[in-house]
Amino acid sequence: MNIVYALTSNFVELARPSMRSLLEHNPKAKIYLLTETDTVETDIPMTVINVSGQTYFNDRNCVNIRNNFGGYINLLKVCYPELLKLNKVIHLDADTIVCDSLEPMWKTDLKGKWIGAVQEKQGHYKPFGPVYYNMGVAVLNLQQMRNDNAVPQMVEYLKAVRQPFADQDAWHKFGLPDKFVDIPLRYNENFATGKTDDPAIVHYCGISDWYYNPRMERREYLEKYR
């Protein structure tokens, strides 16, 4: 099972609880960290990949790159198929806690598809059609994306159009309607997707100062691994 995080080095500490919880429930998982340095001080076994020299978004004069909401590392999420010579990965945001085995999620049948993810609830942001998926947790078929030459299309799109959710919007622009597969809600419980009685992944997206917020719902999951 391949798990990937894309973070600037100053955010790695915030992701440590996510990684600890992942390995407790999935001890054989292999973690890849895409960041802007060669080394990261951590006690968690991982493969660190320095993406600072990549040329995909090196045009600093491009206003849509310079002012991107999520920054350079966030933009590079769409380049996973080229940066990671793997067939398949699970992407996790830093603000997640894993509460169970991810094997069933990992085994999602993505034949011919790009992405397995959880849909956000009706009424949320949907600029590309009737559905929108939360990409903070996603199973990604990197080999199929390479077969479909997806990366150049998404990179050029993000250079030309500044979208509020960058990588997430690019995946939807080119992946809808037929490149997504629905996975169960329990693999990405958050304010946008809904709640479940048996979460496998709790995702604290949309919560102000989530790492320190004492009134945050499901805080007990985070506290266990801090």
Segments the model singles out, each with a brief description of its role:
Residues 1-17, 33, 135, 140-226:
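A glycosyltransferase accessory/donor-loop signature
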Residues 2-4, 30-33, 47, 90:
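A structural signal for isolated positions on well-ordered beta-strands in alpha/beta enzyme cores
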Residues 21-29:
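Short, acidic, metal-binding catalytic loop of nucleotide-sugar glycosyltransferases
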Residues 31-36, 117:
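Short internal beta-strands
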Residues 35-40, 102, 121, 186-189:
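Short, polar loop motifs at secondary-structure junctions
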Residues 39-45, 107-110, 195:
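Short loop/helix-cap segments at secondary-structure boundaries that form the rim of catalytic
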Residues 41-83:
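Active-site-proximal specificity loops/subdomain of glycosyltransferases
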Residues 73-122, 128-132, 138-140:
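GT-A fold catalytic core of metal-dependent nucleotide-sugar glycosyltransferases
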